[in-house]
From Swiss-Prot:
Keywords: Chloroplast, Plastid, Ribonucleoprotein, Ribosomal protein. InterPro entries: Ribosomal_bL32 (IPR002677), Ribosomal_bL32_plant/cyanobact (IPR044958), Ribosomal_zn-bd (IPR011332). Residues 1-23 are annotated as: Disordered. This is Large ribosomal subunit protein bL32c.
């Protein structure tokens, strides 16, 4: 017969959520930093095109 599982504690739930939030915060900071460097023209981490026409030509 099926038995209900025990409830997850608030501490465990909050710990898991904080790990997820820290990971998301790190990704957001990294993407913002990359966007700033692209706008300033100082990026060296990847190759990209400055012209929109080159992006969509197949």
């Amino acid at each position: 017969m099926a038995v209900p599982k025990k409830r997850t504690s608030k501490a465990k739930k909050n710990a898991r959520k904080s790990v997820w939030k820290k990971k998301a915060d790190k990704a957001a900071k990294k993407s913002l930093s990359l966007a700033k460097s692209v706008l300033q023209g100082k990026t060296t981490s990847f190759v990209y095109s400055l012209y929109i026409d080159e992006l969509f030509s197949i």
